[in-house]
Structures are given as structure tokens and as C-alpha cells.
Amino acid sequence: SVDSSFLVGTGFDAIVYNVTLQSDGKILVGGSFANFNGNARRRIVRLQPDGTLDTSFVIGTGFSNGTVRTILVQPNGKILIGGTFSGTYNGVGVKRMLRVQANGALDGSFSANLNGTLSTIAMTSDEKVVIGGAFNSVSGTTKHRIARLLLCVDQTKRVAGAWTNGAPTAGKELFFEEDYTIANTTYACNCAIASGVEVNVSAGTTLALRYQYEGAGLLVIEDGASLH
């Protein structure tokens, strides 16, 4: 029987293509709709577990065209979205794939442009992202209908003398908000340092990054240390 405690009101004004559950019970919904229960929400919305609108998920003007076909929530709470859209998301140009923060704001650290529909997104056990659809190109690289992407799917910050999300691992992005000395060989996805912050890699130690160092701070590689 239909669960009458799921309070969606008038529901959606057009097709729902995807429903994705978050670990906290909230519900991400993507499709071709422009409204949910009388509230303007273009192509994507997040609901509370009881079906009511989650107003903390702020998408602004949403998608200007196309549809949302697939949604994946990363371990760090960021959300990958794919579909047929090729206009803008809240005023910023996007083509078939983007990533938003847990609050719905566009994540400018991620960029992927596809020349055709993105139909499905999945994550492997080693945190690589596999995408499939009707595309032949991913950000200028020829890939026919399927591709695998490398990206950082988790983050830990060094602040107030501690890591905010556990010690560094190969799948995590490191963000330093205070001076720090890396005294043991450390593997990470990438590394960013805040302005005015200095991070030292001690002699005999390696900082091994999947991607790169970035940020406005200073990374010091001592004699006998290495970065790769």
C-alpha cells in the first residue's frame, strides 16, 4: 500500500529519472521537472526522509536546460550529477556532468565536459568513478560511451592540532590550515596549503600524491626528502 506518511504534496510537474538515497536518509531526485510541490526546483531537488522539501539544499536557478539522469554521492558528501544538460547550473556553464557540495553549491574544483548524454555514474572499490552514456569525448579526450575518472573523493584538514577526518590516506585530499611537519612517508590524493601556512617534508620522507600540490601556502622539501 502507499505510505501516506511520505508527504510530497503535489509532487513533481515532469518526469523523475533518478532517486538516490543519502546515508542520512535524505533523498536526492533528478529529472526533467521545474517544480516540486509548488516550489521552483529545476531538474534536481533534495527531500527530507518524510518527503518534504529540504531547503538546506540550495541550487539557486538550477539547470537552464536538459535533464538530470544520474546522481552519485561520494564518501565525503559531495554529489556527482550527470544528464543531458548543456547550459548552466545556477548561472555557471556545465556540460552533462558536474559536482556540487553537500549544500547544493557548485564545486568549482571539479570539471568534466561531455559531448553527449551521461546516463550512469558508479564508483569502484578503490574510489575511481566510472561513467557511461552516449558521449564520445570527455573533456577533449576521446572516450566512446564509457570512461573512468580519477578524482579525490574524500578530504581531511589539519587545523587546531588535529585532522578533521582522520589521518591522511591515498584517497584523501589534504588541506593544511596551520604549519605542519610531515615526519613519515605520506600517501594522499592531492595537497593544498592555505595562504601563510608552511608545510615541511622531513629528510628521508616522501609525500606521494596521486595528483598535485596546490594552494597559496609554502611547501618545503628538505634535503633527502621527496615529492612525487
Predicted regions mapped to residue ranges:
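Extracytoplasmic mature domains of secreted or surface-exposed proteins
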Residues: 1-153
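Extracellular beta-sheet-rich ligand-binding/adhesion modules
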Residues: 152-228
